[in-house]
């Protein structure tokens, strides 16, 4: 059924399992510097670059972007941090410049922060070159992309980490502590999603100094994400951005480590929000953007069934007016947490049939990573999450240890997108979820955020 044969995975998985015996933070690694490159210095890339240049154990040796303005901003950031100037690629707008970057000698790892469609080919090429990959979320576009990325990682042994920052969100990590200590009892049902009004991100004026909420252009006339992300709303209908929600839920339920997804289906509403936005923002129906037919349903609801009996519901909601929320709900036999109302209820501890404020529980169950690093992470992007995810990648790379969000996590979470598209296109069909681990999920043990190091 799939391009990579089961026996190939079994053989390769054995090697990966052996690598899990490596020590997490050997003493020799503590003072080691890593030489990192970055492909993609757009708005997201600059946020991650900020975290790299503030570290004494990282040397940024190469940067690549085909937009000279953004490459220039990246170079300015490195200079202001007092770090040596890295070699640059792409200022001539050569779309293959990233390949030359990967030929540069002495690169330990690369951060990939480009448009989604480039993630898989860039990660594959980097791993084939022996360069460790820290990939921004979305591991691939098609299901075959995910098998190809996985096959390359297993055959080369080159480290790969999906840079899913929400796994490190403060309340999310406190909830992880609660799950592991049995506060919710046995988990039964979880919910999450990417619920974020992106209308002002998918469209802008095309002005590099006004990337958000500034117009209705997209594609070649847009800037930043409006230049590429909006096209996915035109051409695709599915759960386009699953990992922010599914990442924490997968950690809670032990996906790929004692548990797995078995089935998936998805439903999509009609598409109205982006059209109405362009009409209202442009003041009529004459602008070309108002005539575009968007394929992406305004709300996409995806349901996953797990081997151990849990269900997980995801919602993708980016085309309608709304406040930001991930919509987390973690529910078990003893109670539940819901992040929308910042509330929790634990049977035998909470007043009957009443919510309690989550904050006091969060303080009680604060994860050791946040206890140790809250002050350091305070100035980082996304409430500190970006510091933690970069810290994890760098520390694991220095220690030659398994990545805390590994290749199996990456392809499993990201494959929800093409599978949801397939389900919707086939009258909301329920599909079997592929086992990317080839059965290794039965023996693999959880490693994420256990030792207080990363």
From Swiss-Prot:
Signal sequence range: 1-29
Record keywords: Glycosidase, Hydrolase, NAD, Signal
Binding site for substrate: 194, 229, 241-244, 324
PTM note: Predicted to be exported by the Tat system. The position of the signal peptide cleavage has not been experimentally proven.
Cofactor: NAD(+)
Protein EC: 3.2.1.-
Coiled coil: none
Enzyme class: hydrolase
Molecular function via GO: hydrolase activity, acting on glycosyl bonds; nucleotide binding
Matching InterPro entries: Gfo/Idh/MocA-like_OxRdtase_N (IPR000683), Gfo/Idh/MocA_oxidrdct_glycsds (IPR050463), Glyco_hydro_109_C (IPR049303), NAD(P)-bd_dom_sf (IPR036291), TAT_signal (IPR006311)
PROSITE patterns cross-referenced by the UniProt entry: TAT
Cofactor binding note of this UniProt entry: Binds 1 NAD(+) per subunit. The NAD(+) cannot dissociate.
Residues given in the record as NAD(+) binding sites: 43-44, 65, 116-119, 136-137, 165, 224-228, 241
Function, as annotated: Glycosidase.
Family membership: Belongs to the Gfo/Idh/MocA family. Glycosyl hydrolase 109 subfamily.
The protein's name in its UniProt record: Glycosyl hydrolase family 109 protein
UniProt source species: Stenotrophomonas maltophilia (strain K279a)
């Amino acid at each position: 059924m799939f391009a990579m044969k089961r026996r190939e995975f079994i053989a390769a998985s054995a090697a990966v399992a052996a690598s899990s015996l490596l020590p997490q933070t050997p003493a020799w690694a503590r003072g080691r510097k890593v030489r990192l490159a970055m492909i993609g210095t757009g708005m997201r890339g600059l946020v991650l670059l900020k975290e790299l240049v503030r570290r004494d154990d990282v040397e940024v040796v190469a940067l690549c972007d085909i937009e000279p303005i953004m490459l220039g901003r990246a170079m300015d950031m490195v200079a202001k941090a007092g770090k040596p100037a890295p070699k640059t690629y792409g200022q001539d707008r050569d779309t293959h410049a990233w390949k030359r970057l990967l030929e540069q000698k002495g690169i330990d790892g690369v951060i990939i922060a480009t448009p989604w469609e480039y993630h898989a080919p860039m990660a594959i090429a980097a791993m084939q070159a022996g360069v460790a990959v820290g990939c921004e979320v979305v591991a691939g576009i098609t299901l075959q992309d995910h098998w190809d990325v996985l096959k390359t990682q297993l055959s080369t042994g080159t480290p790969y980490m999906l840079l899913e920052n929400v796994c490190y969100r403060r309340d999310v990590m406190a909830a992880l502590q609660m799950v592991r200590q049995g506060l919710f009892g046995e988990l039964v049902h979880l919910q999450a999603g990417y619920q974020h009004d992106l209308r002002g991100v998918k469209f802008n004026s095309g002005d590099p100094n006004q990337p958000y909420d500034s117009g209705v252009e997209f594609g070649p006339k847009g800037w930043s994400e409006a230049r590429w992300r909006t096209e996915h709303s035109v051409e695709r209908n599915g759960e386009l951005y699953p990992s922010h929600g599914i990442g924490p839920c997968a950690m809670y339920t032990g996906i790929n480590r004692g548990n797995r997804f078995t089935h998936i289906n998805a439903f999509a509403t009609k598409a109205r929000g982006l059209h109405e936005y362009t009409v209202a923002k442009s003041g009529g129906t004459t602008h070309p953007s108002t005539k575009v037919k968007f394929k992406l349903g305004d709300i996409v609801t995806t349901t996953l069934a797990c081997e151990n009996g849990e269900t997980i519901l995801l919602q993708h909601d980016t085309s309608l007016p709304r406040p930001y929320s991930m919509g987390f709900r973690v529910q078990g036999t003893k109670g539940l947490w819901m992040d929308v109302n910042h509330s929790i209820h634990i049977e035998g501890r909470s007043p009957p049939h009443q919510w309690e404020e989550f904050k006091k529980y969060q303080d009680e169950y604060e994860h050791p990573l946040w206890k140790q690093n809250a002050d350091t992470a305070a100035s980082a992007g996304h409430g500190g999450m970006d510091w933690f995810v970069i810290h994890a990648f760098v520390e694991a790379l220095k220690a030659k240890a398994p990545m805390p969000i590994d290749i199996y996590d990456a392809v499993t979470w990201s494959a929800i997108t093409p599978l949801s598209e397939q389900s919707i296109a086939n009258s909301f069909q329920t599909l079997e979820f592929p086992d990317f681990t080839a059965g290794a999920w039965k023996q693999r043990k959880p490693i994420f955020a256990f030792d207080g190091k990363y």
